[in-house]
């Protein structure tokens, strides 16, 4: 008998089949660089910067930009942003630069040029006979990179928000050390013609390169990052949420994971902490791995670690955090079970304040306080004969140990208590819920629960 087959009848005919499903052809790829080669892209022939500036600025004013020309110009303009490396810079074994070296964004990556000439049409003609200043180049580079940030703003009813962001970014590139080179609202008008540019690999690569450079190097034009900052930890919402969670509850990653009482966390935790990655290394290629093309399918996204993501944001909802209430539920990752665990953890880390004296008039007052606290602890640890001292953690209402929390969940049959439900309903009902958000899920799931 084949253990993988099932047997049944169809119109009195015996049928034996082996059920199979479509395999996931898009495997998660980790960004670790193993060949010691810098991330690279291939672009057309390097342009004359004056010609390129004139052409790109004309295209921006006409709301008609060629992405290949824009990428070629952005890569060529990197030479204008020379800075000094503050420390030895090494990532995944690649020596990017040494302390004191003069570097540009191009130092971080390998840009291969072909003989293909760009269009450089200069449509609309700009009356520019002199060479553009570095400030003018910096303003144009900054405005072009803002198109990346604007194209990452997606969702319903984002029109006004996007316009306001565009206006604020435009204002940055009108004031020193930058200089005004376009009329007001040009950026938003241009964006409408380039709404999906964040999906263009070369444009995304260059945005990430500029961001990685300006995040490390103290530079006059560092404000260019306003358009590229969204490339940092892109497609890492699962890992970023977990990092924020442990900071919020004031635990180490190891301590926090002990509270994750569900078998589906195992694969996700293993995926999130794969050895050999530079998740905790400052200024690593890891931070910009998505934009630099080092991973096609991120193992750190909300979908890749959906149970972890759901749990963290249910705890956040319990704590009344707007970001968690607005986040999108990963429907395929046990949201009902995660909401139960989130309620208990929310109660443990939010429902009870941790208050204690930390500041004193002098050393004697501090010493007296510590001695008094030590006496209290000794008295609390004494066995009163009613509960085995070895089991106190399981029954003490004040403890936050994983064992105690797990026991309380089991003693309540793996269901939320009335207090948990009332808290969930309270925070979600007073919030304008977005479609498929945690606020909407909690409202629909628990608003009619009478517990």
UniProtKB/Swiss-Prot annotation:
Its main location: virion. The keyword Phosphoprotein applies. Phosphorylated by host. Changing residue 107 to M: In strain: Isolate Human/South Africa/Rv6. The modification Phosphoserine is found at residue 389. One of its GO terms (molecular function) is RNA binding. GO terms for cellular component: helical viral capsid; host cell cytoplasm; ribonucleoprotein complex; viral nucleocapsid. Homomultimerizes to form the nucleocapsid. Binds to viral genomic RNA. Belongs to the lyssavirus nucleocapsid protein family. This is Nucleoprotein. It comes from Duvenhage virus (DUVV).
């Amino acid at each position: 008998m084949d253990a993988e087959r099932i047997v049944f009848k169809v119109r009195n005919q015996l049928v034996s089949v082996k059920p199979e499903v479509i395999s996931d052809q898009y495997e998660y790829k980790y960004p670790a660089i193993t060949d010691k080669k810098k991330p690279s892209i291939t672009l057309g022939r390097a342009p004359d910067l004056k010609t390129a500036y004139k052409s790109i600025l004309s295209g921006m004013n006409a709301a008609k930009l060629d992405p290949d020309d824009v990428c070629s110009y952005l890569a060529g303009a990197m030479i204008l942003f020379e800075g000094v490396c503050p420390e030895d810079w090494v990532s995944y074994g690649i020596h990017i630069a040494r302390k004191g070296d003069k570097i540009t964004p191009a130092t971080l990556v390998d840009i291969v040029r072909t003989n293909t000439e760009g269009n450089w049409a200069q449509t609309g003609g700009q009356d520019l006979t002199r060479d553009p200043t570095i400030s003018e180049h910096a303003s144009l580079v900054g405005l072009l990179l803002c198109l990346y940030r604007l194209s990452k703003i997606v969702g319903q009813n984002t029109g006004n928000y996007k316009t306001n962001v565009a206006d604020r970014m435009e204002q940055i590139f009108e004031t020193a050390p930058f200089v005004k080179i376009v009329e007001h609202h040009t950026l938003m008008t241009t964006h409408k013609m380039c709404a999906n540019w964040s999906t263009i690999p070369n444009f995304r690569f260059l945005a990430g390169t500029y961001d990685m450079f300006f995040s490390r190097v103290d530079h006059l034009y560092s404000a260019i990052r306003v358009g590229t900052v969204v490339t940092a930890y892109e497609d890492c919402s699962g890992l970023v949420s977990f990092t924020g969670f442990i900071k919020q509850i004031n635990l180490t990653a190891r301590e926090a994971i002990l509270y994750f009482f569900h078998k589906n966390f195992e694969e996700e935790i293993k995926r999130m902490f794969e050895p050999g990655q530079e998740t905790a290394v400052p200024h690593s290629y890891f931070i910009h791995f998505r934009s630099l093309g080092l991973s096609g399918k991120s193992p750190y996204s909300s979908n890749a670690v959906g149970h972890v993501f759901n749990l963290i944001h249910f705890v956040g909802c319990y704590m009344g955090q707007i970001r968690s209430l607005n986040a999108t539920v990963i429907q395929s990752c046990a949201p009902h079970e995660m909401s139960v665990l989130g309620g208990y953890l929310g109660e443990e880390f939010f429902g009870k304040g941790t208050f204690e004296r930390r500041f004193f008039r002098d050393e004697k007052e501090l010493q007296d306080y510590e001695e008094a606290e030590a006496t209290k602890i000794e008295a609390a640890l004494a066995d009163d004969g009613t509960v085995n001292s070895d089991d106190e953690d399981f029954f003490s209402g004040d403890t936050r140990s994983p064992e105690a929390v797990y026991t309380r969940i089991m003693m309540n049959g793996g269901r939320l208590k009335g207090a948990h439900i009332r808290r969930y309903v309270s925070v979600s009902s007073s919030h304008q819920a977005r479609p498929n958000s945690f606020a909407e899920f909690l409202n629909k799931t628990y608003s009619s629960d009478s517990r």
